[in-house]
Amino acid sequence: MFKLKSVNLQVYIMLIAIAVIMAFFSVATDGAYLSARNISNLLRQTSITGXLAIGMVFVIISAEIDLSVGSLMGLLGGFAAIADVWWGFPLPVTIIATIALGLIFGIWNGWWVAYRKVPSFIVTLAGYLAFRGILIGLTNGTTVSPISGTMTVIGQGYLSDIAGVILGGIAVIGFVLWGNYQRRSRQQLQLEVSALSKDFTKYALFAVIVLGAIYLLNDYRGIPFPVLVLAVLAILGLFLSRKTSFGRHVYAIGGNIDAAKLSGINVEKTKLIIFAMNGVLVAIAGLILSARLGAGSPSAGQNAELDAIAACVIGGASLAGGVGSVFGVVIGALIIASLDNGMSMLDVPTFWQYIVKGGILLLAVWIDTSNKKKM
C-alpha cells in the first residue's frame, strides 16, 4: 500500500511539474507556448524521446543501461534516408529493413551483455562510438535528402479532425471499460478497491485531457502521426510490463538477480529480449526522426540517449534497477520536451539549456535516493 501511494504521489508530482512548466513558458512567451501549433510541435518532439524512453526503461528496470541509443537512432534513421533517397526502396521495404536492422543491433548488444557478461555500460559505450562511425561512413559525412513525400508522412503527417475525435472517443470508452474490468477483478479477489467517486473523477479527468488535447490539435492540423505511434507503443509497453510474465521477469531481475535465477527465470534470455526490443523501438524513433527532418544527417541523434535516460529517471525509474513504469517515462519525456521547447522559444543559450536539464536530472535522482532511504 505504501509503495502504491508513493507511485501515485510521484505521478501527481510529475503532472504538477508539467502544469508549472507550461504555465511559466506560456506567460514568458505571451501565450505562444500553448498555441495549437506549438503544442503540436511539442508532442512531435515528445514522440521521439518517448519512444527511446519506453525501450530504455525496460533496460534500466533490469539494472542495465544503454548509452548507444542516440547513435543507433541516427544510424537507423540515416539508413532509412539512404534506402529512400539513394536506393529508391518502397516505403514498406524501408520500414521493415530499418526495424530488422534495429532488432539485429539490439540482439548484438544483448548478446554481449547477457551471454558474454560484459557490463552494459562498456558494450553500449562501444556501440555509441561504433554506430556513429558507421553512420558517418555510410553517409560520407553528408546530409541525405530530400526524403520522399510518402516517407515524410511518418514524421509530418496528421490525422483528420473527424478521425481524431472518433479515436479520442474510443480511447475514453476503452479507458473506462478497462478501469471497470480491473475494479471487478479486484472485487472478485476480495481486494481493496477505490471509491466509485474517485474512479469517476479519474475517468472525467482522462476524458477532459484527451478530448481537450484533440480539440486543441484539431485547431491546427490534427493529431500528428508520431503521437499516434507513441500512444500505441506506450499501450503495448504498459501491457507488456504489467500483464505478462516477461514484464514480471524484468522487474524480478532488476530487483534481485540472484533470487530471479533461483526462481527459475532465464536471466540471459530475458536480457537478450530486452535489448532486442530496445533496438526495435530505437529503429521506430529513427524512422520518425528522419521523416520529421526530411533528411538523414550524420549528426542526428546526438545526446538523445541522455534525454532518454533523463526521461526515465524523472519518470520514476531507478538506475539501481527493479523500479520504473512506462507511463512514468512517457510523462518524463514530455517534461524534457517541454523544457527544450520552451527554452528554445525564449532563445535561451544552448549552454544554459544543458545546465538546466542537468540540474533537473540531478534533482530527480536525489529525490529518488532520498525516498529509498525513508523506506
Swiss-Prot record:
A GO MF label: transmembrane transporter activity
Pfam families: BPD_transp_2
Membrane-crossing residue ranges in chain numbering: 9-29, 52-72, 85-105, 118-138, 159-179, 199-219, 220-240, 271-291, 319-339, 348-368
Localization per Swiss-Prot or TrEMBL: Cell inner membrane
Membrane-topology annotation of the record: Multi-pass membrane protein
Assigned GO CC terms: plasma membrane
Family (UniProt): Belongs to the binding-protein-dependent transport system permease family. AraH/RbsC subfamily.
Function of the protein: Part of the binding-protein-dependent transport system for D-xylose. Probably responsible for the translocation of the substrate across the membrane.
Protein name: Xylose transport system permease protein XylH
Provenance organism: Haemophilus influenzae (strain ATCC 51907 / DSM 11121 / KW20 / Rd)
Source species taxonomy: Bacteria, Pseudomonadati, Pseudomonadota, Gammaproteobacteria, Pasteurellales
